[in-house]
Amino acid sequence: MKKVQRQMKWLFLAASISAALPVSAAKMVQVDDPSLLEQALSMQARSIVPTQNGFQVVKSVTLPNGKVKVRYQQMYHGLPVFNTSVVATQTEKGIGQVYGMLAQQIDSDVVSTSPQVEQKQAVSIALTHYQQQNPSLTSADLVTENERAQLMVRLDENQMAQMVYLVDFFVATNEPARPFFFIDANSGDVLQTWEGLNHAEATGTGPGGNQKTGFYQYGTDFPGLVINKVGNTCSMMNSAVKTVDMKHATSGGSTFSYSCTDASNYNDYKAINGAYSPLNDAHYFGKVVFDMYKDWMNTTPLTFQLTMRVHYDSNYENAFWNGSSMTFGDGQNTFYPLVDINVSAHEVSHGFTEQNSGLVYQNMSGGINEAFSDIAGEAAEFYMKGSVDWVVGSDIFKSSGGLRYFDQPSKDGRSIDHASQYYNGLNVHYSSGVFNRAYYLLANKANWSVRKGFEVFTVANQLYWTANSTFDQGGCGVAKAAQDLGYNKADVVDAFNQVGVNASCGVVPPTENVLEKGKPVIGLQGTRSSEAFYTFTVASSTSAKVSISLGSGDADLYVKAGSKPTTSSWDCRPYKSGNNEQCTISATPGTTYHVMLKGYSNYSGVTLRLD
């Protein structure tokens, strides 16, 4: 053997990377350069890893095709760094492809991580600020729930690293809200605020239906409800979902239970505003959403039991996710009660986004956030019914048509069809049209479907999107997810291109020689340590063999998918003496495969071939 390589555990230091790429101040950088990873790993191999710095594992995701992806969160002295994430492919050989964003040279801006403002003070500052911005609210009116403050590091719009608290809480009033704040952890200044309550403007039917959809029965027309029964009392609760009757209040509520004295366990409480039983609707649809995520993605939409709160307030024409539960109004003139499969999946999926990518609910990231929930709503409709109408809210919208449209979002008179129509401050429900249409175009391509489209968007949410992802970054994440799943990445890039989003991840078409199947390249020569690069792609999934033969001297063959191989980063490297080497790989369309010939010694007369 020419050399023995040591497999190293994947966990590298932010400090190591900073040393590898010297800069003068904090800044965000993209991690996809194999040479950067090579430097970081090399330095890591010689270091003792401090647990408070570097990257911590957030989750490990096993894709339906068996590939294992690991997502890491950057840490600085034990604090998470906002809007950073690195994803790596775990293979039998160790770590494969890497992609993500990290912050460099934080220590040039943040010297100490001991905050001058305590956690409770940060919450109090946020509450005071919220009340000042909403003077009509008295202290007695300001009823809050789920108060949270997390200490972290972020880079502001000027690339200045700051230690901050991310504070949020739910305001339980007739006009519910969930404000978010960045509070300076030293000065107590309010640096940024945004409204994070994930409202649903479009909804659908519930168990029993409504006057528009018609009446149907669970247990006859659809499977029965999964409930809990003790004696003659039934409760709407199971391992995935509990359903709460709010009784037209804006806070409180308890799990709905009813008398059930026979085997039918029949519940018809209660008909309202043209719907036959919104409580049944919510309970059934919540379970369907959990089942879809489990069956299709081998995951759960939430890390905790879902709470579905029904009959919220009086004549409330909306639905929202407050960070821990889903809440439905009964509608009035515009809507029937807002419980249906689309809305249930939509709002629960805001929770999924919050627990995965953490997309901020404003700007482009907010549009992606809202679109993912719309996409999940259509996916759940397909999972339940076997078909979709590509319209958001048609079943519970009392007028004709719907609230949002996938095929042409601008049909609603407000949403945009193309990224070129986006402007700062555009409502996230309207900017969602860009990703909604991209999903529609992708799902309707040959060899694609509602399910496959949902899979790539979901993996992007799990692994590649970050808090402030732009449209291009979000599209790149979906393309990378398609590649991970073995789907046609080029189809994803094309779908996003049609809506003005560059999903190519900034990849420049290769300028190296392109190999063609069955057409050998002959007479190759090089000196010791020289490197020559070639690329190839395939039109359909196939077994591809790359080989070198003949000639004198010693050339080594390297092959890697997605980026140039190096001596420490490759998918195949026979590493034999002489020039008779070959690599056989399972190639998929939409991926560029890179080939390197490296001179172990001077070589000449070598033939390179793709079969």
Swiss-Prot record:
Enzyme Commission code: 3.4.24.-
Keywords: Calcium, Hydrolase, Metal-binding, Metalloprotease, Protease, Secreted, Signal, Virulence, Zinc, Zymogen
Any one GO molecular function term: metal ion binding
Key word Zinc present: yes
Signal sequence residues: 1-25
PTM notes: Seems to be more extensively processed.
InterPro entries: FTP_domain (IPR011096), Peptidase_C_arc/bac (IPR007280), Peptidase_M4 (IPR023612), Peptidase_M4/M1_CTD_sf (IPR027268), Peptidase_M4_C_domain (IPR001570), Peptidase_M4_domain (IPR013856), Zinc_Metalloprotease_M4 (IPR050728)
Binding locations of Zn(2+): H346, H350, E370
Cofactor entry: Ca(2+); Zn(2+)
Record's cofactor remark: Binds 1 Ca(2+) ion per subunit. Binds 1 zinc ion per subunit.
Keyword Secreted found: yes
Chain residues in the propeptide: 26-199
GO biological process per UniProt: proteolysis
Record GO cellular component, one term: extracellular region
Active site positions, chain numbering: E347, H429 (proton donor)
Localization per Swiss-Prot or TrEMBL: Secreted
UniProt function note: Extracellular zinc metalloprotease involved in the virulence mechanism of V.anguillarum.
Family: Belongs to the peptidase M4 family.
Protein name (record): Virulence metalloprotease
Organism: Vibrio anguillarum
Gene: empA
